[in-house]
Regions:
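Long, low-complexity, intrinsically disordered polar/charged segments
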Residues: 1-8, 116-121
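N-terminal small-domain helix-loop-helix segment of the aminotransferase-like
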Residues: 2-5, 11-103, 110, 157
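Residue-level signal for pocket-adjacent positions within structured domains
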Residues: 5-8, 63, 142, 149-151
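Residue-level detector of flexible, active-site-proximal loop/helix-junction positions
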Residues: 42, 75, 105, 129, ...
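Alpha-helical elements of the RecA-like P-loop NTPase motor core of helicases
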Residues: 79, 109, 130-134
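PLP-dependent aminotransferase-like
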Residues: 96, 114-162
Length: 162
């Protein structure tokens, strides 16, 4: 059987959603410790569920939802986002400005691929969700972290950005 090597594009990519940090957390759970696992970004295990209205809408539309949506996303969802933007007095948001996706991971990846050229620097807060750093690196960007300190209510340190 032919052996496949990982791409060198992954050499500088760290993604601790899996790997040694998760392995250590699992070991701690096995030792009887309580570990709050926030590494996947799934709110459901923490008691956050979709509102009943959304669940009912999903159920009533399941028969008509068996294909691909428009590449920008479902029209009614995009319209609702535009209307919400208007309610919040966010100027100049039009339907053509709004894209939806299958979750934030897909959209972060699309944005990084579309906006970063090789060697472009991108400011990313630290601590960060590792997907930001991983996708920026894979897109050819050079990640520059700036500190958000808990003692400062997580506000960024402007001097650190310079």
């Amino acid at each position: 059987m032919r052996k496949f090597e990982k791409s060198s594009k992954l050499d500088n990519v760290l993604y601790d959603v899996r790997g040694p940090v998760v392995d250590e957390a699992n070991r701690m759970v096995e030792d009887g410790m309580e570990v709050l696992k926030l590494n996947i970004g799934n709110p459901y295990p923490f008691g956050f569920s979709a509102p009943q209205e959304v669940i009912l809408d999903m159920l009533s539309n399941i028969r008509t939802s068996q294909g691909y949506s428009d590449s920008k996303g479902i029209f009614s969802a995009r319209k609702a986002i535009m209307q919400y933007s208007q309610l919040k007095h966010i100027p100049n948001v039009t339907m053509s400005d709004i894209y939806t996706g299958n979750g934030v991971s897909e959209l972060i990846n699309l944005c990084m691929q579309a906006l970063l050229d090789n060697g472009d620097e991108i400011l990313i807060p630290a601590p960060d969700y590792p997907l930001w750093t991983a996708t920026a690196t894979l897109a050819g960007g050079k990640v520059v972290h700036y500190i958000c300190d808990e003692q400062s209510d997580w506000y960024p340190d402007i001097e650190d950005m310079r």
